[in-house]
Amino acid sequence: MKPDAHQVKQFLLNLQDTICQQLTAVDGAEFVEDSWQREAGGGGRSRVLRNGGVFEQAGVNFSHVHGEAMPASATAHRPELAGRSFEAMGVSLVVHPHNPYVPTSHANVRFFIAEKPGADPVWWFGGGFDLTPFYGFEEDAIHWHRTARDLCLPFGEDVYPRYKKWCDEYFYLKHRNEQRGIGGLFFDDLNTPDFDRCFAFMQAVGKGYTDAYLPIVERRKAMAYGERERNFQLYRRGRYVEFNLVWDRGTLFGLQTGGRTESILMSMPPLVRWEYDYQPKDGSPEAALSEFIKVRDWV
C-alpha cells in the first residue's frame, strides 16, 4: 500500500489527545495548549501540564512540518533525499513527576516521507519509549519491559530484543559511562515489510506507552519521601539534561535546523541540580541506582 501521511497524522493527533486525557485522569490537572505555526511550512500543538497533583511537569508535543527541500544537514548522510519535498510528523512526550519514587518517562513516535514526481516515495517510521527511575523497583522494571515485549510479539519474536538493545545503546551517556535509565524500546528507519505493517507497529508503541507507565505511577505516587530523596531526584535529573543537550539526535537536529526551541526543550526538567563529585553513601538506596540501571534482561 502507498504510504498515507494523512492517516498517520490523524492517528498522531488522536494519540496526543488520548495520552493527555490519561495523564489528566491520574493527575487531576489540565494541560495548557500552545498551537504554533512554522514559517517554512507546518506547525504543531504543544501541551504542558505544570505543578499538578502527581506530575511536576508533563509535556506532550505534536508537530507536523513540511517543506520543498530538506536541509543540507539531513541530505549529507542520505543523498537520496536531495531534491525531494518532505513531511515529518510525530508525537513526543516527557513526564517529570513530583515524587522521586515515580520514574521519569519519555515516549516518541514519528513518521517521515520525502517525495518527488516520477519516483517512489522515501519513507520510514521511528519511535520508542524509555524509563528513568531514581529509585529502582524490580517489579516496575519487569512490568515496563514485559509490556514492551508483549506489544512487540505480534510483529515477530526478534523485535523486542532488537529494539531493546537499540534503546540501551542509544540512551547511554558516554561521558559518564552510564545508562540514562532502564531503557525500553527504540526503533528508527522502519520501512519493511510494507507501510501497513510498519504503521501498525508504530501505533502499538504509541498506545503501549501508557499501558507500561501508568500502573507504575499508580503504584508509587503516594509513597512518602523527604528532602534526601528530593535532592537525589534533582541531582539525577541533571543526567537527563546532559543527555538531551549532548547526545540526543532529535534535540540537536531540531536546534540546528531552526526548529521551535520552546517545544524542543519542553523535555527539560523544571528543576535540576548539579553537585561536584557527588558520591552516595555505600549501601544506601541512592548508591544502588548505579547497579540497577546497568543493562540487563528484565524479561
UniProtKB/Swiss-Prot annotation:
Mn(2+) binds at residues 96, 106, 145, 175. Pathway: Porphyrin-containing compound metabolism; protoporphyrin-IX biosynthesis; protoporphyrinogen-IX from coproporphyrinogen-III (O2 route): step 1/1. Changing residue 175 to L: Complete loss of oxidase activity and absence of manganese ions. One of its GO terms (biological process) is protoporphyrinogen IX biosynthetic process from glutamate. Pfam families: Coprogen_oxidas (PF01218). It comes from Escherichia coli (strain K12). Gene3D superfamilies: Coproporphyrinogen III oxidase, aerobic. The active site is at 106 (proton donor). Substrate binds at residues 92, 108-110, 258-260. Optimum pH is between 6 and 7. Keywords: Cytoplasm, Heme biosynthesis, Manganese, Metal-binding, Oxidoreductase, Porphyrin biosynthesis. PROSITE patterns: COPROGEN_OXIDASE. It catalyses: coproporphyrinogen III + O2 + 2 H(+) = protoporphyrinogen IX + 2 CO2 + 2 H2O. GO terms for molecular function: coproporphyrinogen oxidase activity; manganese ion binding; protein homodimerization activity; tetrapyrrole binding. Inhibited by protoporphyrinogen-IX, by metal chelator (EGTA) and by low concentrations of heavy metal ions. It comes from the Bacteria. This is Oxygen-dependent coproporphyrinogen-III oxidase. Residues 240-275 are annotated as: Important for dimerization.
